[in-house]
A protein has these predicted regions:
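Conserved GTP-binding G-domain of TRAFAC-class P-loop NTPases and closely related GTPase folds
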Residues: 78, 82-102, 351-396, 401-409
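The catalytic "switch" region of P-loop NTPases
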Residues: 3, 28, 44, 212-386
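Pre-Walker A adenine-sensing motif
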Residues: 2-20
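C-terminal alpha-helical "lid" subdomain
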Residues: 130-143, 147, 155-160, 188-192, ...
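Hydrophobic anchor at the beta1->P-loop junction of P-loop NTPases
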Residues: 25
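Amphipathic alpha-helical scaffolding segments
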Residues: 39-45, 52, 295-301, 408-411, ...
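P-loop NTPase nucleotide-binding core
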Residues: 31, 35-270, 446-450, 463
Length: 465
């Protein structure tokens, strides 16, 4: 990937020679977090070693949580009750949906799993697929057909045919079409009826057990909404040992979610991937979190935990708004020990140098130019040095602020140009006067914006302390 296209931290986030790794990236709006996330995802997908999952819209899951909790949308920070188990559920949901898409494109990977592993995967998909695209039933049905051993279906069919045949013996005897010893007619019919009754009793017992397991599973899920009918169907059809995959009585919710996440990662590995890469971005664009620091903090804080960030086979990459930096900078000793971000990649502020922003600007000029390729330096007047332009861009530090400054600069300069200016005149070049005016105005706006963000962050830290 070209060096100009992404932030220098790209190389720290994409280690194609190692396994999945976690990272926490803070940046203000317009700093290029989403562009960096897209570049990281593109690099990981091109490498193909890991299953890459992007979560850029958390509202569908948060809406489920609000409904499950019975909270009104007007309640202040209705997400304070989110815990780590809920957020691992969200990860499992996003991962199972992405895995279903990947298996559609590469169905051969499913053949690498044993029948018991396919049954485990089927239950995970039935429980965690959020059905945002309406394809949950199709995926569960496909996995059910692939998870049930063919010999069991054949054996069940033969058992049913033999039972039905035994029950029909008296009718056949009365019709006189087949000669059967009268003394054997009743025992054969009773055996046939017993076989059918046994099948019916077994089916009823499996259905009741499935309903019981389904109720226990659904009661623990607050951020996903499993389809009860599909879950009962899966629990009824799959082997009896499959149900404990989802719930075990002796463990807490959080322990159970860690076990399920580790189980999914192992399934992913057994299908040929090195692990799971999960990229979370744009939480400040959530309509439910409303870009409120307290709501976003309630959503992210449970995830900043050493056990989760360092989970083997999981690369959790969080692209977070800079307002949440007090979660790290203002953390006390106990919280720092819990997070252990020294063992993960941490970008505490996504900033760009003047040279990097200049390269981005030059690339935009090339893309927008109909004539010969040009660069920003060629548009500056003789009294204006390129070093000064780099310094101005460096002070702004983000693509959004830098490009806003350049836009205002060219607009200001264009307003001063005379109508009769000759095409070949040097007057077209940006003057120092326009540069100084817009540099001062842009610097003031940037300082005001960052001061407001710092105040918001301080308020967050004060409330938490």
């Amino acid at each position: 990937m070209d060096s100009w296209a992404v932030h220098p931290s790209y190389e720290r986030l994409v280690d194609l020679n190692g396994g999945p790794s976690s990272a926490v990236i803070f940046g203000e709006r317009g700093s290029g977090k989403s562009a960096l996330r897209r570049s990281v995802a593109k690099g990981l997908k091109a490498d193909g070693k890991s299953l890459t999952v992007e979560v850029t819209d958390v509202d569908p899951w948060l809406e489920i949580f609000k409904l499950q909790a019975g909270q009104s949308k007007q309640r202040a920070n209705g997400f304070a009750r989110l815990d780590r188990a809920d957020l691992i559920d969200l990860m499992l949901s996003a991962a199972t949906m992405r895995l279903g898409e990947s298996l559609k494109a590469e169905p051969s990977r499913l053949k690498k799993l044993s029948s018991s592993q396919r049954a485990e995967l089927c239950l995970l998909v039935a429980a965690y697929h959020a059905n945002f695209e309406g394809d949950r039933e199709e995926q569960v049905s496909h996995l059910l057909s692939a998870s049930r051993p063919w010999w069991k279906s054949v054996g069940r069919a033969i058992f049913a045919v033999l039972g039905a045949a035994g029950c029909l013996v008296p009718l056949v005897q009365l019709g006189g079409r087949v000669s059967i010893e009268p003394s054997a007619t009743l025992p054969v019919a009773l055996v046939g009826a017993g076989m059918l009754g046994l099948m019916a009793a077994h089916s009823l017992w499996r259905t009741l057990m499935a309903r019981r397991a389904m109720g226990r599973i659904a009661a623990e899920m607050r951020i996903t909404a499993p389809d009860r009918r599909l879950m009962r169907r899966a629990l009824t059809v799959l082997p009896r040992g499959s149900a404990p995959v989802l719930t075990q009585g002796e463990e807490t919710r959080e322990e159970g979610r860690y076990r399920l996440l580790q189980g999914l990662i192992q399934l992913v590995r057994d299908m040929g991937w090195s692990g799971l890469e999960l990229l979370v971005d744009r939480i400040d664009e959530s309509t439910l979190l409303q870009a409120r620091v307290d709501c976003m903090g309630s959503f992210i804080d449970p995830v900043l935990e050493h056990k989760l960030l360092q989970l083997d086979g999981l690369g959790l990459k969080l692209f977070l708004p800079v307002e949440l930096t007090p979660l790290v900078r203002g953390a006390g000793p106990e919280r720092l020990r819990r997070m252990r971000l020294d063992k993960a990649t941490l970008v505490d502020e996504l900033r760009w140098s003047g040279q990097e922003l200049l390269e981005l600007a030059d690339r935009r000029l090339v893309a927008a130019s109909n004539g010969p390729a040009t660069c920003l330096g060629e548009l500056l007047g003789e009294d204006l040095d390129l070093v000064e332009m780099k310094d101005a861009l460096h002070t702004l530090g983000t693509p959004r602020l830098a490009f806003a400054f350049l836009r205002d600069l060219f607009e200001d300069h264009a307003r001063e140009l005379p109508d009769d200016l000759h095409r070949d005149s040097d007057g077209w070049r940006v003057s120092r006067g326009a540069f100084e005016r817009q540099r001062a105005a842009s610097s003031d706006r940037a300082r005001t914006l960052r001061r407001m963000m710092r105040q918001t962050s301080v308020m967050r830290g004060t409330v938490e302390s």
